[in-house]
Amino acid sequence: MSTESTEERILAALEEDAQASYAAIAERADVSKPTVRKYIDQLESDGVIVGYSADVDPKKLSGQSIAMVGIDVASEQYVEATRTLQELDSVQALYSSSGDHMLMAEVRAADGDALGDVISDEVLAIDGVTAAHPSFLQERLK
């Protein structure tokens, strides 16, 4: 048996395959199905598991461009700007960051031109947003 805790083994199985059945997770984590169910229910209730998602290869999506956008925000307008960014349909994910930018956003649009329009017309139009630095995703490597 692994030195990882039961919770860590269950979470690792879910991170590898969010669609895995309780039976598959139980086998991988070396616990019973009821134990898996109990842990998952508790982790969801505690807000540790906040959702399940699919990993998407952007190159296989026809007619869609994806960029990770570093966003700089005036400190005094951070909360409101963040709320507004969260409401944009084209922003698929938004993260606070300790790197070069205060926020990192995954932005999707029909193509590169549309993505540029979203950044200039929507993201940069938000009060408090001082700069946006897009990096267009080319190929998923892992």
Curated annotation (Swiss-Prot):
GO terms for biological process, alphabetical: response to amino acid
Keyword NAD attributed: no
Swiss-Prot/TrEMBL induction comment: Transcripts accumulate during exponential growth. Is also subject to negative autoregulation.
Known DNA-binding region: 22-41
GO terms, molecular function: sequence-specific DNA binding
Summary of the knockout phenotype: Leads to strong induction of aspB3 and OE_6130F.
Gene Ontology annotations for the cellular component aspect, listed alphabetically: cytosol
Location of the HTH asnC-type domain: 1-72
Alphabetical list of Gene3D superfamilies matching this protein: 3.30.70.920, Winged helix-like DNA-binding domain superfamily/Winged helix DNA-binding domain
Keywords: DNA-binding, Repressor, Transcription, Transcription regulation
SUPFAM superfamilies: Dimeric alpha+beta barrel (SSF54909), Winged helix' DNA-binding domain (SSF46785)
Recorded superkingdom: Archaea
NCBIfam families membership: TranRegLrpA1_Halo (NF041395)
Function recorded in the entry: Transcription factor that regulates genes involved in amino acid metabolism. Represses the aspB3 gene, coding for an aspartate transaminase, in the presence of L-aspartate. Another target gene is the basal transcriptional regulator tfbB. Also binds its own promoter.
Name of the protein in its database record: HTH-type transcriptional regulator LrpA1
Species per Swiss-Prot/TrEMBL record: Halobacterium salinarum (strain ATCC 29341 / DSM 671 / R1)
Gene: lrpA1
